[in-house]
Amino acid sequence: AFAFFAPLDLRPLPGLTIELSMSLPAGAPSDAVACFVIPQRRIIVLRYEPFSWHRSWFGLAADKRLYRAVIAHEVAHAIVACHAGEPRLSFAAQEYIAYVAMIATMPEEHRRELLALHPGSGFDNVVQINEFAYAFNPARFAAESYRHCIRQPDPRAYLRRVLDGGVIQGLGGY
């Protein structure tokens, strides 16, 4: 994930830790396999064994390729949390960036498999990129976010604008 964000001139995060754990902290959604604890700059990822108990995630087998993708997603959240512009990014913008990074860093064959499981052409406009779309179907949100981003004339510059705030608004305009 750091290599993915390098062209955006984002530096490694001092003090960022990745912890492998048999469980996630209390309050994490029951279907979550990882989380980022912002104040502590700590990524907590299920160890591979409990991760694999999920059998599948987004329709893909819970294998080592997907495990790496999940870690890339959480590292993207950490980068976003530490480099986002003000005001704080909306939840939808944070997930958009994290899923674009996750899918973009997957091996090509794995990425094609994920996208085939969740067909579409990408969001038509930024108004469609919102918390409702995410809550209704996170896997589709992920695939449509990636497709939307790569359709941009300069996807990296577009991600930089999203990261700087103002492109993807949350519900209620923030």
Task: State each model region's role.
Residues 24-25, 49-53, 78, 85-87:
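Solvent-exposed loop/turn segments at secondary-structure junctions
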Residues 1, 63, 67, 71, ...:
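Stable alpha-helical elements in mature extracytoplasmic
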Residues 65, 81-103:
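Post-HEXXH active-site segment of zinc metalloproteases
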Residues 6-20, 82-91, 110-119:
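Surface-exposed patches in mature extracellular/periplasmic domains of secreted proteins
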Residues 69-82:
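Active-site recognition of the HExxH zinc-binding catalytic motif
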Residues 108-174:
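Long, well-structured alpha-helical subdomains associated
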Residues 50-71, 89:
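Short pre-active-site segment immediately N-terminal to the catalytic Zn-binding motif
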Residues 1-48, 61:
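Auxiliary, metal-adjacent structural segments of Zn-dependent hydrolase domains
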